[in-house]
Amino acid sequence: MSTSRRDFLKYFAMSAAVAAASGAGFGSLALAADNRPEKWVKGVCRYCGTGCGVLVGVKDGKAVAIQGDPNNHNAGLLCLKGSLLIPVLNSKERVTQPLVRRHKGGKLEPVSWDEALDLMASRFRSSIDMYGPNSVAWYGSGQCLTEESYVANKIFKGGFGTNNVDGNPRLCMASAVGGYVTSFGKDEPMGTYADIDQATCFFIIGSNTSEAHPVLFRRIARRKQVEPGVKIIVADPRRTNTSRIADMHVAFRPGTDLAFMHSMAWVIINEELDNPRFWQRYVNFMDAEGKPSDFEGYKAFLENYRPEKVAEICRVPVEQIYGAARAFAESAATMSLWCMGINQRVQGVFANNLIHNLHLITGQICRPGATSFSLTGQPNACGGVRDGGALSHLLPAGRAIPNAKHRAEMEKLWGLPEGRIAPEPGYHTVALFEALGRGDVKCMIICETNPAHTLPNLNKVHKAMSHPESFIVCIEAFPDAVTLEYADLVLPPAFWCERDGVYGCGERRYSLTEKAVDPPGQCRPTVNTLVEFARRAGVDPQLVNFRNAEDVWNEWRMVSKGTTYDFWGMTRERLRKESGLIWPCPSEDHPGTSLRYVRGQDPCVPADHPDRFFFYGKPDGRAVIWMRPAKGAAEEPDAEYPLYLTSMRVIDHWHTATMTGKVPELQKANPIAFVEINEEDAARTGIKHGDSVIVETRRDAMELPARVSDVCRPGLIAVPFFDPKKLVNKLFLDATDPVSREPEYKICAARVRKA
C-alpha cells in the first residue's frame, strides 16, 4: 500500500500527540518476546542538533530496537526519524571495505587498508613537499564525533601546518557563530532547552521547527497547551506547520526580516517598552561602521525603520510589527529561536545581531525562559566543530587563528615549536572548493558529509572536484552519497553506535554515545584511521599518541581547562553515568551550567563580581547592540527572473537522505523532490498541482513536480534538497556573508513554467 505524504503527516501528528500525552516516545513500543533486547546501550540520536538521548536495544550482537532516553533532556521522546534509526544502522547499503579509483574516470575497486593508507599518506606527503602545506585540506562535518574532529584539526593545523580545515557547519551555523561572537564575545547560546518550559513568549524566525526539530517543537506546543496565555510569534515567508500553532504569523517578503526586526526595536523604544536599567549597565552601542555610539544614536538610527514604512517594505500589516514588538517586550520571559532562514544569508551575521539586539534592549536575556537561542542542524556541529575549533579561522575552545596569544597557547598545549600554527586563516568552504578547481588545493579528505550534493552552485563544485590533479579521499558510510562519484579513495568508517564518542548538541550539552554493536566488514573507527594516516604521512608520532577515542577526549578536556568553555569535569566515567552535561563544567562535582554570564550560576563569572551579569567575552563585560543596515539579498527578483527561490526542509528526510533514504516508511512518504508554488502564482502561469514544471535560475534549470498550496507567500517558490536524483543546489548561487562566509541558500531569483 502506498503512503501519501498527507497520510504520513497525519500519522506523525497523531503519534506525537499520543506520545506526548503518555510520556512515551517513538520507539518505546512493546517488542515481541523473540526480539526483546538483552541490553540497552546509551547514546545520542544521529540526526539533528537537538541531541536527543537514545537507548539502543541489542540482542545477539545486533541492534534490534531504539527508544528515547527518559533521563536526557528529551525525556524519552524521539521524532519519527529518530525512532527509525535502526534500519539505517542495519542497512545492507554500506561501504564495508576501502575502495580506490586507480585513474580518473575509472571505477572504484576494492583495496586493502594497508595499500589505501599508504597511497593516502604518500599523496598528501608529496603534495606538501612539492606545493606546501596549503595544498592539502580537511573538509569535515557536524556529524563526526568530537574526538574525530579534534584529531583531524590537530593533524592539519599542528602536524601539516595548514589551516585548510573547514566543514559543513560553515554552510549552516557560521553566521550564528558570528552573531554570538560579535554581540557577546563568545559563541554558543547562554540558555538551554529548559528555557522552553519557562518562556511566556516565543519569537520563532527563520525556523520551521516542526519539521527540522520536531522534539523541540513538541515541547513548545506542550508549553502552549499547558499555559494557553503563552504567545507564539512565527516570522517566516512560508506558512509552515510551525506557523499553524502561532498566535501571529508574519509572512514577510524574503530578505526583509532585518528591517522588520529594526522596526520592532523602534516600537519598543518609542513606546518605552525597553529596559534602561539593563542596557545602561550591561550594553554598549556600536554604529554601522563598528564605532562606539550610544542609546540616542541607536534611537536616531531606527528612525529609518518606522513601522509604516517597513510594513510596505516587508508587505505585512503594520499591526503585526506593533503586535510582535509589544508581545516580545511585555512578556515575562521571551525566547527567540532561529535556524537556517536567518543564518544562510549574505546578511546572516547581521540578522543574528538584530535578534540579540531585541533581547538586550528589553533585558529579555540570561533569565529562565528569556534567551536568544540559535537552533543547530547537526548532532555535533556545536561540540565537535564550533567548540573544537575545526573551522579554518578557529582553534579549540574559543581561540582564533589570527590571535597570536591563542596560537601560542595551542602550540604549547600540543607540544609544537613556536610559530608552527600558521597565522592566516585557511580557505572557508566556498573558497576551498574554488581552490580545488584552480589546482591550488591538490589533496582533500572529506569526512561524513556530502558536498557534491549540498554545496551551492553545484555545477561549479562538480567541475572543481573533477580537476585532473585532485586527490579526494572520502570517509563515508553510504555508497549512494553523490560525493563518492568524485572520490579517488573511499575509506569505510564505523557508523554512529559502532564506535564510542561524544556529541555536543545545541544547548552546550555533551553526551556520550557508547559502542553498542560491531561495525560490518572492514569498517574502522575514524579516530584510528586518522591516527594511522598521520603516522604514515610523517606527522610526529607524539602529536597523535592516541590509543582510542577516550585518550582524545581526555586531551580535549585538558585543552578546554581554564577557558570559558571549560569542561574538565566531564570525565568519560561521568558521561557514561549521566545523560549529558552542559558546559562550563570545570570540576567533577560541578553540575553543569544552565545560564551563562550570570553571577552565581556561571563559573566563569567571579563569585564576587559586582554585577549580576558579566559578558566576559567582551573586554569591559558589556554586550553590544549593533546598528546593522538592513541590506537586501545578493540576487533579487527582476523582470527576467520574477520569483524568489528558497530551500526548505521536509520532516521525512534529513540532509541528503543517505540515511533516511534507507528507511522505507520515510522514503515512501516523500520519494522525490518537488517545488512548492503559491496558488496565485500557479494560477497566473497555468500550473496545476502535480504538473511537471521547469524551475530556472541564472545557474541551471531543473524539472520538478509542482505542489500548489498556500504554504509559500505569493512570489516565493521553495524546493527541498534531499533528493540525489534532483540536485536542486545547482540552482542556488554561492554568494556568502562577508563575515561568516556562510552561503545564501535562502534567497535567489528564479522563474517557473510548465514543462
Swiss-Prot record:
Post-translational modification: Predicted to be exported by the Tat system. The position of the signal peptide cleavage has been experimentally proven.
InterPro entries reported for this sequence: Asp_de-COase-like_dom_sf (IPR009010), CT_Nitrate-R-NapA-like (IPR041957), MoPterin_dinucl-bd_dom (IPR006657), Mopterin_OxRdtase (IPR006656), Mopterin_OxRdtase_4Fe-4S_dom (IPR006963), Periplasm_NO3_reductase_lsu (IPR010051), Prok_molybdopt-oxidoreductase (IPR050123), TAT_signal (IPR006311)
Activity-pH dependence: Optimum pH is between 8 and 9.5.
Enzyme class: oxidoreductase
SUPFAM superfamilies: ADC-like, Formate dehydrogenase/DMSO reductase, domains 1-3
Regulation: Activated by potassium and sodium ions and inhibited by magnesium and calcium ions.
All residue ranges annotated as the 4Fe-4S Mo/W bis-MGD-type domain in the record: 38-93
Cofactor (UniProt): [4Fe-4S] cluster; Mo-bis(molybdopterin guanine dinucleotide)
UniProt GO molecular function: 4 iron, 4 sulfur cluster binding; electron transfer activity; iron ion binding; molybdenum ion binding; molybdopterin cofactor binding; nitrate reductase (cytochrome) activity
Keywords (A to Z) from UniProt: 4Fe-4S, Electron transport, Iron, Iron-sulfur, Metal-binding, Molybdenum, Nitrate assimilation, Oxidoreductase, Periplasm, Signal, Transport
UniProt-annotated binding residues for [4Fe-4S] cluster: C45, C48, C52, C79
Location of the protein in the cell: Periplasm
Disulphide linkage map: none
Family: Belongs to the prokaryotic molybdopterin-containing oxidoreductase family. NasA/NapA/NarB subfamily.
Function: Catalytic subunit of the periplasmic nitrate reductase complex NapAB. Receives electrons from NapB and catalyzes the reduction of nitrate to nitrite.
Protein name as catalogued: Periplasmic nitrate reductase
Organism of origin: Desulfovibrio desulfuricans (strain ATCC 27774 / DSM 6949 / MB)
